[in-house]
C-alpha cells in the first residue's frame, strides 16, 4: 500500500532537497521573529 512507498520517498534525493528547503525556510522565518 501507500506505507510501503514511504521509505522510497524518504530516500529519494528530491525529498531530501525539499526537506532541506523547508528546514532552511523554517529556520530563517524563526530568526526573523
From Swiss-Prot:
Coiled coil: none annotated. Pfam families: Pardaxin (PF07425). One of its GO terms (cellular component) is extracellular region. GO terms for molecular function: toxin activity. Keywords: Ion transport, Membrane, Secreted, Target cell membrane, Target membrane, Toxin, Transmembrane, Transport. It is found in: Secreted; Target cell membrane. GO terms for biological process: monoatomic ion transport. Belongs to the pardaxin family. In aqueous solution exists as a tetramer. Consists of a C-terminal hydrophilic region and a predominantly hydrophobic remainder. Exhibits unusual shark repellent and surfactant properties. Forms voltage-dependent, ion-permeable channels in membranes. At high concentration causes cell membrane lysis. Causes death in killfish oryzias latipes in 30 minutes at a concentration of 25 micrograms/ml. This is Pardaxin P-1. The lineage of its organism: Eukaryota, Metazoa, Chordata, Craniata, Vertebrata.
Amino acid at each position: 500500500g501507500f506505507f510501503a512507498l514511504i521509505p522510497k520517498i524518504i530516500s529519494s534525493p528530491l525529498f531530501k532537497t525539499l526537506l532541506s528547503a523547508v528546514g532552511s525556510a523554517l529556520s530563517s522565518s524563526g530568526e526573523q521573529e
